Amino acid sequence: MSENKTRVDNAATGDIQHQGKDIFFAAVETTRMPMIVTDPNRPDNPIIFSNRAFLEMTGYTAEEILGTNCRFLQGPDTDPAVVQSIRDAIAQRNDISAEIINYRKDGSSFWNALFISPVYNDAGDLIYFFASQLDISRRKDAEEALRQAQKMEALGQLTGGIAHDFNNLLQVMGGYIDLIGSAAEKPVIDVQRVQRSVYHAKSAVERASTLTKQLLAFARKQKLQGRVLNLNGLVSIVEPLIERTFGPEVAIETDLEPALKNCRIDPTQAEVALLNIFINARDALIGRENPKVFIETRNLLVDELANMSYDGLLPGRYVSIAVTDNGIGMPASIRDRVMDPFFTTKEEGKGSGLGLSMVYGFAKQSGGAARIYTEEGVGTTLRLYFPVDEAGLTNTESPQASDRRLGSSERILIVEDRPDVAELAKMVLDDYGYVSEIVLNAREALKKFESGNMYDLLFTDLIMPGGMNGVMLAREVRRRYPKVKVLLTTGYAESSIERTDIGGSEFDVVSKPCMPHDLARKVRQVLDGPNGIA
């Protein structure tokens, strides 16, 4: 028997009346920490001794608990997994410490910091289990209050940043739209002035669209179009982007893993993430001697023991891409916040503070992680991890747009609960030669089909009230009318990379906001596709 085991004397039984036990139980009785002793040699491992502190903590009397198992302390919010871990430790005669929600006699709950240890006699026989306990409810409440305060601080920073950026964009859009309206009322229209106003208003819309995508990326709520690709190929694709970002004065070095595995990520969002990393590296290199950027890719195996070193990545195979600069680096106080939304050290107007938060969200939503290593005066490394995908490579080049730019009077049913959004979609599609109708919910759409109206395409919003969303409607239409093509639209998608047996989404999706020519092209692609999937 191990000499580390707790022993009480050389007796061979668990008789608590034995004279040799007096010192042990006297010590347990007089301590202020709640303690109990159980007897594993009796059926159901009952409590055979409890001190006054335990009785005061739980509200029970000794007569009520002696001879019973400790499970009377459990209740509705007690974690079954923790209970099972305690049972396993007792069965294996191991020490265990755990934090668990227990219940007093009056039904109130409390957080219990529990430590259980087996007690042996000199003959090596297990005679007791000793359990010390501590009510840590105040500590838990304080931790929760701190988390809530931190959450509210982050929320305040987030909403303040959103309001600031969107108010500026609304100012631009509203101002130029007013100018266009004023120009239309004049007897002689200044066409160039109107065109300039339209250009600036559209630019503001595009910036607002980028902002919402960055926010969704941080929240891991954006719709990702996952494709199997190789990060080495991605580096080659973004080489012109790297050169434009850093210019000739920054030395670029690469070390790419020759046998790098593939991964499934959204190539467009991956390029945006790398651009954000490059921009931060470029800014960190301003004024530095011999500025240098080093890009590397690696294969990585994360096992059970190492996963906590990789921000909790699940065990498995990963690929990584890292960008290292020899810039100014950053202190720990900034490093810990650099991926928070709207946190920026740049001057007003020089950055939104969403770049690295978007990188973080994109990596997490892709099933990976983002880690930053930095040292003041030395430089910074930002490394992204993505799960390996054994599927074949997908062509990441944009498909050639169909030569059929205009509709051929195909009939489209628009399902959108926002009348203004529906009307805009109808105007766009009608302008491109389609014949479109509007309904405001899924039930009305089904009635249109049931009444004999036939359509070539169902164009429906994803999230709608009334108990039937866009996906449910699309599935029902596909079931009843298999020849009808389907295109979904949304400004918000909870799913990440959708994986199905055919390697893609069940239905094609176009994200809001969408420029008219992009919508028309997507509609054309879906109509020309064999199964409604472009």
UniProtKB/Swiss-Prot annotation:
* First-tier enzyme category under EC: transferase
Q: Please, which domain of life does this record's source organism belong to?
A: Bacteria
Q: Which residues carry this modification: Phosphohistidine?
A: H164
Which parts of the sequence belong to the Histidine kinase domain? 161-390
Name the Enzyme Commission number(s) assigned to this protein: 2.7.13.3
- What functional role does this protein have? Photosensitive kinase and response regulator that is involved in increased bacterial virulence upon exposure to light.
Name this polypeptide is given: Blue-light-activated protein
